[in-house]
A protein has these predicted regions:
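Conserved core of the sugar-phosphate nucleotidyltransferase
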Residues: 76-170
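A conserved hydrophobic position in a structured secondary element of the catalytic/binding core
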Residues: 20-21, 74, 159, 178
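Hydrophobic/aromatic residues located in beta-strands of well-ordered beta-sheets
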Residues: 16-18, 64, 94, 125
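N-terminal glycine-rich phosphate-binding loop and ensuing alpha1 helix
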Residues: 1-20
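Short, high-confidence coil segments that cap the C-terminus of an alpha-helix
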Residues: 13, 59-61, 88-93
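Donor nucleotide-sugar recognition loop
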Residues: 171-179
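Short phosphate-binding loop-to-helix
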Residues: 17, 23-81
Length: 179
């Protein structure tokens, strides 16, 4: 799976690294010719792991993109979309969500392994949850997917490097502990 993700990402980005704390993953990446960075097993978040990897790489990038290794169906267009967000100098962090569609069921929506994102009217993420958000009071659950444009969060995060450094220096919030 990691090779598939690596190959998909490499179609769009030049400098691709796998940040891992697992020697087996490191060796697997090197075996298929990829670049891997060993990181501490003690990170509290993937964002902290990415910051460590960025520091170890030692190259000056303006933007760092974290794509989860368990996203084998990531599309080139999704990576390009998140990259274009940074054409605006005011963009500091970007991520993506995709709509739950007609093929999804309420069980898909309830699945805690499928994080949801709620956005404001401008499309800016306000909140992420493994629970169904928002709760549609007064609407039968069988109608929720057709009544609200629920978004599934895609495991892709991008940061301006200075913001990545700033947020990883902050203490962990209570919501991060439980999310």
């Amino acid at each position: 799976m990691i090779q598939r993700v690596y190959e998909q990402v490499s179609k769009v980005l030049q400098d691709v690294y796998v940040a891992t704390d697992d020697q087996r993953i490191y060796e697997a990446v090197e075996a298929f010719g990829g670049k891997a960075i060993m990181t501490s097993p003690n990170h509290k978040s993937g964002t902290d792991r990415i910051q460590e990897a960025y520091t170890k790489i030692g190259k000056p990038f303006d933007v760092v993109i974290n794509i989860q290794g368990d996203e084998p169906f990531i599309h080139e267009s999704q990576i390009e979309t998140v990259c274009r967000c940074f054409d605006d100098d005011n963009t500091m962090i970007a991520t993506l969500g995709r709509p739950f569609n007609d093929s999804h069921t309420f069980a898909d929506l309830e699945n805690p392994n499928s994080p949801k994102v709620v956005c404001d009217n401008r499309g800016f993420a306000m909140y992420f949850s493994r629970s169904v958000i928002p709760y549609l009071r007064g609407t039968d659950k069988t109608e929720w997917l057709s009544s609200f444009p629920y978004l599934k969060h895609i495991g892709l995060y991008a940061y301006r490097t200075r913001v990545l450094q700033e947020i990883t220096a902050l203490p962990q919030s209570p919501l991060e502990v439980y999310y």
